[in-house]
């Protein structure tokens, strides 16, 4: 740091500016981070070395500006240095106001004041439209500093606030509409927003005419779209959308003007609303007088209503709270709905796009009758040539289809019957796929998401279009395989296929084979081409197809031929493949476990060994183990049991975790529940004599309560049923043994109670409609799709119930215990072992089952 400061003494401005750039890049680290002792120590060092020399340098360069008033080249370098120092000022003051800066605040504010009012025609390029000049960039940096002080250091800044506010106001009213002034204008409006929104400064804006002047001189001019904005709408629609509805417009004039309106409404809502309603009325009158010439006025009026009415919003739900002073539904009925149906889809597309945005923003206020009225017009607008317009329409339709009834969040406002009775399914899908068929921008993620939503919401009503829709999707899949460049688009594509599979096969399981015929060729292409982004999706849908096949039909020949390939080590090396691949193998074992033997079984156990060695993937290893135990005969897997248990015990002895114990005890429960305790105990005794009893005493029963708290309902059932079979099979040995063995019997019974009671952890694979839609909406809003692995919400994995024949596990526990007690009384053992709570629950089971315990 001292070496940097020493270079301030050179006369070469380019060297000084280079040093300042270096310092700026170093000091940026102090912005937007949480304070810590280490951070403050670093900041203290930087301040001690830099703060005084920087003030002196700023003052020196300011003096040089006055001397070089006619030297453009020198002025340009000087202003660049002053701008960089202003950014450094921001960094050094972001965490807290340093003592030196507080002591010298008058000197700093004097310098800033000078440049807020500085003019020099030499630094103004009248022919430049887009790139900001030296004065504008410096002023924007200074205003950022003033906004920081106004926001965080109000008391220290208060003496300078009125004059600074007046200067910034003057800049905003004098600045032209050219793009080169955009950053300066937006920054100035942000400053005003931070001031007007605070109660502390309320008196400044209570003078007659102040609010009206802000609205008239600052808000309205900056809210109205310019030629450059309409050019962007036509020439770079993707960027227009990114700014307008994806939240990247934080530095635009319109966004800053909207935020200024919202800021004024915090303390002056009534007055600002009344003022703005006047302007809205004037703008609408201008439009009605000559729509073709004044459509921008109506566009601005819609944006003003949005600014006034929306008080809270989220990307996933639109407006969540609105102003009582703005009649949104009246404006919707008188201005928005007529506009959407006015003339053809290509007439004034930007105004229509803004109208669709309004509709989408306030979608939570709409009832099914409103949507029924709107849908035909929206379907027509899908034909629009404008990329922005048909994209906004697709997004709006998609959002309307996930609206839920306020009184019953499980019910969609526009569900399957709504789409079917209004004849909307085919027109919507036809219009949406037509957009994707256009040569420009073929991978429109908003359109693909709308297709996904229509497909899912339509439910069984999608059946007549099934083959056509699936054909469209597979053709798109073939195209994107060549260059998977848009993760969101690709995710929605596979979600669409998953929704189609789910809806059709759930209604008619016999259609599973037809889906396999249509999907296997493109899926095989994905696997052969090794499209890493898509293989996890393919495996999920293939697993889903198997899981939805009619019971007892087994896997098709295509799956059987593919099964050995699924066990190839290379596939399991890719992290994103592991969860869906494990699910697919599990589904195959469930459907056709009898077909697995020999080399395939050995390779499968090799996969288990690999997964078991990984903390990240161990749960998938146990899934495979459970599938083997539940679906293969003992004769097939018993030769390998000793090795399997040895691997388990090595992991446990190396440092057991509750998660690993849950998987281990669950797999043992499935083994014992399916084949009996003797199979497990015999194999374990070959590993180490006495280890089975040790596991029962020190792992199974000791940790049963903890395991129950982290297990889902289906897993707890598997644990409970397996543990019931365990105490039944072990009863003769344990009840005939010593006091410790009898107590172990009681602890096993208590473990079964704890498993069946447990806590209500949700099944991760449960196909819950509301949860699935909400999770998908959150993922979309956050943009959290991963190229490595993204779970398909519409391909939800069903809960794993290895004991489907046991309808009531609690009744089974009571009946099993009654049978055991018929041979050997257990009442005294249970009374002496079980906790009061467990005895109470057990009593409830016994009473409900109508049995007796001796």
Name the predicted role of every residue range.
Residues 1-854:
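Karyopherin-beta/Importin-beta family HEAT-repeat alpha-solenoid scaffold
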């Amino acid at each position: 740091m001292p070496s940097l400061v020493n270079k301030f003494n050179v006369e070469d401005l380019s060297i000084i500016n280079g040093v300042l750039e270096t310092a700026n890049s170093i000091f940026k680290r102090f912005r937007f981070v949480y304070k810590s002792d280490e951070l403050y120590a670093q900041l203290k060092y930087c301040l001690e070395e830099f703060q005084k020399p920087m003030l002196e340098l700023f003052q020196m360069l300011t003096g040089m500006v006055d001397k070089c008033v006619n030297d453009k080249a020198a002025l340009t370098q000087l202003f660049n240095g002053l701008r960089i120092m202003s950014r450094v000022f921001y960094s050094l003051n972001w965490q807290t106001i340093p003592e030196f800066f507080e002591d010298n605040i008058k000197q700093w504010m004097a310098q800033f004041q000078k440049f807020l009012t500085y003019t020099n025609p030499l630094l103004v390029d009248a022919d430049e439209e887009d790139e900001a000049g030296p004065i504008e960039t410096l002023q924007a940096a200074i205003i950022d500093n003033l906004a920081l002080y106004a926001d965080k250091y109000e008391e220290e800044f208060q003496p300078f606030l009125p004059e600074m506010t007046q200067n910034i106001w003057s800049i905003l009213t004098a600045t032209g509409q050219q793009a080169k002034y955009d950053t300066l204008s937006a920054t100035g409006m942000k400053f005003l927003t931070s001031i007007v929104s605070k109660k502390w400064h309320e008196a400044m804006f209570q003078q007659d005419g102040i609010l009206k002047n802000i609205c008239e001189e600052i808000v309205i001019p900056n809210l109205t779209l310019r030629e450059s904005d309409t050019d962007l709408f036509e020439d770079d629609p993707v960027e227009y959308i990114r700014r307008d509805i994806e939240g990247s417009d934080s530095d635009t004039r319109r966004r800053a003007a909207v935020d200024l309106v919202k800021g004024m409404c915090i303390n002056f809502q009534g007055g600002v609303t009344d003022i703005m309603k006047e302007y809205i009325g004037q703008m609408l009158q201008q439009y009605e007088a000559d729509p073709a010439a004044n459509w921008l006025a109506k566009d601005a009026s819609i944006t003003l209503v949005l600014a006034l009415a929306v008080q809270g919003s989220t990307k996933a739900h639109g407006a969540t709270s609105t102003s009582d002073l703005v009649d949104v539904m009246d404006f919707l009925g008188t201005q928005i709905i007529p506009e959407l149906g006015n003339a053809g889809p290509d007439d004034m597309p930007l105004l229509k796009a803004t109208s669709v945005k309004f509709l989408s923003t306030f979608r939570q206020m709409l009832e099914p009758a409103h949507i029924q009225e709107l849908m035909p017009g929206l379907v027509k607008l899908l034909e629009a040539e404008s990329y922005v317009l048909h994209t906004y329409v697709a997004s709006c339709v998609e959002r309307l289809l996930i609206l839920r009834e306020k009184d019953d969040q499980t019910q969609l406002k526009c569900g399957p019957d709504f789409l079917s009775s209004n004849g909307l399914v085919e027109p919507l899908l036809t219009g949406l796929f037509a957009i994707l068929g256009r040569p420009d921008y073929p991978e429109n993620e908003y359109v693909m998401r709308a297709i996904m939503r229509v497909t899912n919401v339509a439910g069984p009503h999608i059946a007549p279009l099934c083959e056509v829709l699936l054909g469209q999707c597979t053709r798109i899949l073939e195209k994107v395989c060549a260059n998977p460049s848009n993760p969101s688009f690709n995710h929605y594509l596979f979600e669409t296929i998953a929704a189609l599979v789910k809806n059709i096969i759930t209604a008619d399981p016999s259609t599973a084979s037809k889906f396999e015929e249509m999907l296997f060729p493109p899926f095989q292409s994905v696997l052969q081409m090794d499209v890493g982004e898509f293989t996890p999706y393919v495996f999920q849908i293939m697993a889903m197809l198997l899981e939805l096949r009619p019971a007892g039909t087994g896997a098709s020949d295509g799956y059987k031929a593919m099964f050995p390939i699924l066990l190839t080590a290379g596939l399991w090396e890719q992290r994103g493949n592991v969860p869906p691949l494990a699910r697919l193998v599990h589904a195959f074992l469930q459907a056709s476990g009898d077909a697995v033997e020999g080399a395939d079984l050995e390779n499968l156990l090799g996969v288990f060994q690999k997964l078991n060695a990984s903390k990240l993937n161990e749960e998938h290893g146990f899934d495979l183990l459970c599938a083997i135990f539940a679906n293969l005969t003992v004769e097939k897997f018993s030769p390998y049991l000793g090795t399997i248990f040895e691997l388990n015990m090595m992991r446990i002895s190396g440092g057991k975790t509750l998660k690993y114990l849950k998987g281990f005890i669950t797999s043992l429960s499935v083994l014992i529940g399916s084949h009996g305790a003797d199979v497990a105990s015999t194999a374990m005794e070959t590993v180490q004599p006495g280890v089975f009893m040790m596991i029962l005493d020190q792992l199974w029963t000791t940790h049963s309560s903890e395991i129950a708290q982290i297990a889902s309902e289906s897993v707890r059932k598997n644990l409970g049923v397996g543990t019931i079979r365990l105490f039944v099979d072990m009863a003769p040995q344990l009840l005939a043994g010593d006091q410790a063995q009898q107590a172990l019997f009681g602890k096993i019974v208590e473990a079964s109670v704890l498993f069946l009671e447990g806590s209500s952890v949700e099944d991760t694979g449960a196909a819950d409609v509301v949860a699935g839609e909400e999770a998908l909406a959150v993922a979309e809003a956050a943009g959290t799709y991963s190229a490595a692995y993204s779970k398909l919400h519409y391909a939800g994995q069903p809960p794993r119930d290895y004991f489907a024949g046991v309808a009531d596990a609690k009744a089974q526990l009571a009946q099993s215990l009654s049978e055991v007690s018929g041979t050997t009384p257990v009442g005294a053992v249970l009374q002496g072992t079980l906790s009061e709570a467990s005895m109470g629950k057990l009593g409830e089971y016994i009473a409900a089952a109508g049995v007796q315990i001796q």
